[in-house]
């Protein structure tokens, strides 16, 4: 298997994917949504950056963002003119440390659907991050959200980590043990300890 990251960062609206995305469907249905990320440090884990319609919204926002330069904080006033802009804007200008997310919870402004895109340090990608750092980030998200049960019960939370590599497909998935018809226990990995030893993070 291979990965082609041709549209993993913001570029010109002359190129990119074109099919209708979930945020567009939510927008059309009148469901509030927002993508919380730090730009430029989202570790290119926001696939919407590769779609022409979001690239166009970025170009027409008056505050275009990119993966290669400091970006202005998201301005909610832009939403009236370019509602797709909040999918690629710098909505967590604090470096991705959840300040805006926590503020939106405290002020009752958390949308019905929230995506969180972790910055590089918490992406769980081998080298800049680890499962421990990703778990801490997820814990902080959930703590912030569950501090307010009224908000918690009225939102969908989606967390984006490092797109399609990193630890999740390099460590054998856990398997629930089960017994066969002879009572023998099954469910462990078929790889030897030596074969998987380099996959563990110390």
Model-assigned labels for residue ranges:
Residues 1-202:
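N-terminal pro-sequences and low-complexity stem/linker regions of secreted or lumenal proteins
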